[in-house]
UniProtKB/Swiss-Prot annotation:
Keywords: Methylation, Ribonucleoprotein, Ribosomal protein, RNA-binding, rRNA-binding. Forms part of the ribosomal stalk which helps the ribosome interact with GTP-bound translation factors. It comes from the Bacteria. It comes from Cereibacter sphaeroides (strain ATCC 17025 / ATH 2.4.3) (Rhodobacter sphaeroides). PANTHER family: 60S RIBOSOMAL PROTEIN L12, LARGE RIBOSOMAL SUBUNIT PROTEIN UL11M. InterPro entries: Ribosomal_uL11, Ribosomal_uL11_bac-typ, Ribosomal_uL11_C, Ribosomal_uL11_C_sf, Ribosomal_uL11_N, Ribosomal_uL11_N_sf. Part of the ribosomal stalk of the 50S ribosomal subunit. Interacts with L10 and the large rRNA to form the base of the stalk. L10 forms an elongated spine to which L12 dimers bind in a sequential fashion forming a multimeric L10(L12)X complex. GO terms for molecular function: large ribosomal subunit rRNA binding; structural constituent of ribosome. One of its GO terms (biological process) is translation. One or more lysine residues are methylated. This is Large ribosomal subunit protein uL11. Gene3D superfamilies: Ribosomal protein L11, C-terminal domain, Ribosomal protein L11/L12, N-terminal domain. The keyword Ribonucleoprotein applies.
Length: 150
């Protein structure tokens, strides 16, 4: 007999840097899940990614308090800012897009980079082909104030 699913939980955790402190600890603890088991499994699964890359994860938890992880690709905005070479700024030391998208340009990327990002995110996007996925990524670039050349 299959395990009974109680629910699922979406988190965005930095690759290889999961720890039991907030937001991970409280989110798992209030559901009675083993926090350290999650931390070890997540860090092991994200060991091949660049450390610090924000990684969305869907945690499905079962009646016997066990869980399974489904890792997603990093957010399109993160990949675009990285491709544009935007420098980290602010208290959280993260790259920022334009404060006024459409009026100010924060950085530029080539169409080839957009295609590469679209191909990487294809499994997580609601698109039938790479061209449709590129349109989604182009919309994200426009929202970040990143100009596309070529």
């Amino acid at each position: 007999m299959a395990k009974k699913i109680i629910g699922s939980l979406k988190l965005q955790v930095k690759a290889g840097q999961a720890n039991p402190s907030p937001p991970v600890g409280p989110a798992l603890g209030q559901r009675g899940l083993n926090i350290m088991a999650f931390v070890k499994e997540f860090n092991a699964k994200t060991a091949d990614l660049e450390p610090g890359t924000p990684t969305p994860v869907i945690i499905t938890y079962y009646q016997d308090k066990s869980f399974s992880l489904e890792l997603k690709t990093p957010p399109a905005s993160f990949l675009l800012k990285k491709a544009a070479g935007l420098a980290p700024v602010g208290k959280r030391n993260r790259p920022k897009g334009s404060a006024k998208p459409g009026r100010e340009v924060a950085g530029t990327v080539a169409v080839a980079q957009i295609r590469k990002i679209a191909e990487a995110k294809m499994k997580d996007l609601n698109a039938n082909d790479v061209e449709a996925a590129m349109q989604i990524i182009l919309g994200s670039a426009k929202s970040c104030g990143i100009e596309v050349k070529g």
